[in-house]
UniProtKB/Swiss-Prot annotation:
This is Ribosomal protein uS12 methylthiotransferase RimO. Its cofactor is [4Fe-4S] cluster. SMART domains: Elp3. PROSITE patterns: MTTASE_N, MTTASE_RADICAL, RADICAL_SAM, TRAM.
């Protein structure tokens, strides 16, 4: 891993003392866990009376919530910072890059008036006040311990109908390739009651899809209760008036019989399993410090399909890990072809200083790793197309997220598609010309499919909120 290439040629300028609160904008980068932190900072600043703009051009100060998971993410964060600095913006750098490279950022970017660590975003109002007073602030805890809850102000940035709910922060596992525990600390779970209370708040705001996130969601509760309580959490969320509860980041060993039973029994918990398996070959999994015993992933998938035969399965994989041979890769390719996942994401290995994998020998040439990624995705595409094609001719529920009043076309998602990472459903008006508004869940008859997306037509019914098609 290389440190981000930062700029040091811009002269330092003093921070002027301001009588009025400055306008503030946010630039969000990285994962949805980072998004929740951004939303809390937005809520805190709004509550404190700051003018929060959605346009960086209108703001005097820009809070950049950064990502530092892999080299590409760091480079994107640095490009964003430099671009804003060149516009003359004062910067508050938050998130994983701030946690990772705090001194380098302050030394190299004069416009950086403050840095805020991953466990310190709750202090954003105090940090901004100190910046207004002319201070340059380093608010980064060496060992993050904070986790936000339902009492912390929050201003959502997602579509009205979709919300992310962080059930825990940090991670107790030490996968060889992952820097996250060093950036976000050990696992800190929220109490069940706290999570359910926030879910009720979100339901009152009209949320139709609640997405549970943490680093290892299925490990929820182990630190707090002495044993995982994810099954109990899912059961409790079954009492919340939100039609879809989706789970991201399900670590394989956490999918116990009790958890699978909750998926099966709780009506609003979607049978959508996001499984970061990373690889299939025991040698590679062992080097990754992942569950590696022979056929461990095969047995897990067999158990899932036995308990949840209609489950939608997504996985993420890493190719080019140090020591991965052609035989190892072929094992992975055969695994993908045999298991026939609905959705697959593939990443090439990114060496990170401070992780065990950074010092491993037998690095795979980046061009070979990239070619393996392309081969794996080419193998998966016809599988994904076949999995989608099964839905043609069926009527399914679709959550509408976009609507073009000129054409009548709508875009939404069904329960087999998670936001951002999976496909979409293109929805045409019903035979009577009816259209559905964003934020509504409506029946759609599926008429077509491709590798990633579905196409369908709104079903005429008196039970849904619709708007009449406007004549042109």
């Amino acid at each position: 891993m290389t440190k981000p290439a930062l700029r040091s040629d811009i002269p330092m300028k003093p921070t002027a003392h301001k009588q009025e609160k400055p306008s503030v904008a946010f630039a969000h980068l990285g994962c949805e866990k980072n998004r929740v932190d951004t939303e809390h900072m937005l809520g805190l600043l709004t509550e404190a009376g700051y003018s929060v703009s959605s346009d960086e051009n209108d703001a005097a100060v820009v809070v950049v919530n950064t990502c530092s998971f892999i080299q590409d993410a760091r480079e994107e964060s640095v490009r964003t910072l430099i671009g804003l600095a060149e516009q003359g913006k004062e910067l508050i750098i938050a998130g994983c890059l701030a946690q990772h490279f705090q001194e380098e950022l302050l030394e190299s970017i004069p416009e950086a008036k403050a840095i805020v660590g991953t466990g310190d975003y709750q202090h954003i109002v105090d940090v901004l006040k100190r910046v207004e007073a002319g201070e340059r602030v380093n608010r980064v805890s060496a060992f993050p311990t904070f986790v936000g809850d339902e009492t912390l102000p929050r201003q959502r940035t997602t579509d009205q109908a979709v919300a992310y709910l962080k059930v825990a922060e940090g991670c107790d596992y030490r996968c060889a390739f992952c820097i996250i525990p060093k950036l976000r600390g050990d696992q800190r779970s929220r109490p069940v009651e706290s999570i359910v209370a926030e879910a009720h708040q979100l339901a009152e705001q009209g949320v139709q899809e609640l997405i549970l996130i943490s680093q290892i969601t299925t490990n929820y509760g182990l630190d707090l209760y002495g044993k995982p309580k994810f099954a109990e959490l899912l059961q409790a969320l079954g009492e919340v008036d939100i039609p879809w509860v989706r789970v991201h980041y399900a670590y394989p060993t956490g999918l116990t019989p009790e958890v699978l039973a909750a998926y099966r029994e709780v009506p609003n918990v979607l049978r959508y399993l996001d499984l970061p398996l990373q690889h299939s070959h025991p040698d590679v999994l062992r080097a990754m410090n992942r569950p590696w015993q022979t056929d461990v992933n095969e047995r897990l998938l067999d158990r899932i399909r036995e308990q949840l035969p209609d489950a939608v399965l997504r996985t993420t994989l890493i190719v080019g890990f140090p020591g991965e041979t052609e035989d190892h890769f072929n094992h992975l390719a055969a695994f993908i072809e045999r298991q026939r996942f609905d959705h697959v994401g593939v990443f090439t290995f990114s060496p990170e200083d401070g992780t065990a994998a950074a010092d491993l020998p037998n690095r795979v040439d980046p061009s070979i790793a990239a070619a393996r990624k392309d081969r794996l995705m080419a193998l998966q595409q016809p599988i994904s197309a076949e999995r989608n094609q099964r839905w043609v001719g069926r009527t399914i529920d679709v959550l509408i997220e976009q609507h073009n009043p000129e054409t009548g076309a709508m875009i939404g998602r069904c329960d087999r598609f998670a936001p951002e990472v999976d496909g979409e459903v293109l929805v045409l008006p019903s035979e009577k010309g009816l259209q559905a508004s964003p934020g509504t869940m409506v029946p759609v008859f599926i008429t077509g499919s491709d590798v990633y997306d579905l196409t369908g037509q709104l079903v005429d019914t008196n039970a849904m909120a619709v708007t009449a098609q406007t004549s042109q």
